[in-house]
Amino acid sequence: MSPIPMRSLVRGFKPYTAGLSIDEIREKYGIERVIKLASNENPLGTSPLVQHTLETHVGLAFRYPQAGNPRLVKAIAAHHGVSPSRVIVGDGSDEVIDLLFRICVEPGVNNAVAFMPCFGIYTTQAALCGVELRQTPVNADFSFPWDNLLKLVDDKTSLVFVTTPDNPSGYTPPVAELETLAKALPDTCLLVLDEAYMDFTDDEADYSLAKRLDEFPNVIISRTFSKSFGMAGLRLGYAIVPEELADHYWRVRLPFSVNLMAEEAGIAALQDVAFHDETVRV
């Protein structure tokens, strides 16, 4: 048989390394009782309202979800006080990040920038898309060396990723530093603030630009339902982006990538404020 046709960069590609599931741990180490903390899953499980919603809608699993998930988009927009035209959703925030690379960065021309270490999806998807990802190490105390980051940025930089709160350190830069960074970037560069853990901060306004996006047209806020909402297994993420980018996102996103169960669960999760708040308190 002739060699299977394959892009050269895929041969020897280093995949994302996920944490082991409980079943894998039991099988590998021969133990029954496993307390899993490695993947930052919600210790309270899944919202009772989300569970009820899934039970109610499981009979509709034969249906395709509505294109563009407009009910979910509207619920997320209301949650953040933004226009639905700025909200995009994906099969986990992984899909959102992947499509940002595919939409915003021209392979061989543009580049992206991030700190090191960073969320593994940045490196895998940059590599898969043939995009140069420039990185600089965080400081010894895990704080962010902004000057070093900005030295990597040039007129060909399309995306700058900052994870805040950072994982695994938990370091969270004050909002004033994010303001300075956003203003220092070229007009042609987008600042992606990956806020998967932002719900766990004491006062979001001290650390996030999510409520001030009208002041910063080059800022994207990315979030997930996996952590504080306890829905990691359903794969649901979203971002608040400039309207023009949202329009192009919906053009290229795979149809129905957010399934009907995840959509209904996401809407319910936003309604169960008590569960969310108890998760944050714990």
Predicted segments with their positions:
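N-terminal "arm"/small-domain region of PLP-dependent enzymes with the aminotransferase-like
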Residues: M1-R63
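Short acidic capping loops at alpha-helix termini that bridge into adjacent secondary structure
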Residues: R33, S83-V87, G108-N111, K156, ...
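Short glycine-rich anion-binding loops that position phosphate/pyrophosphate groups of nucleotides
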Residues: N40-P43, S93-D94, F119, T164-P168, ...
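Phosphate-binding glycine-rich loop
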Residues: F62-N111, C129
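PLP-dependent aminotransferase class I/II
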Residues: G68, N218-V282
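PLP-dependent aminotransferase-like
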Residues: I103-V162
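Active-site pre-lysine segment of PLP-dependent enzymes
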Residues: A127, F144-K156, P168-L191, E195-S228
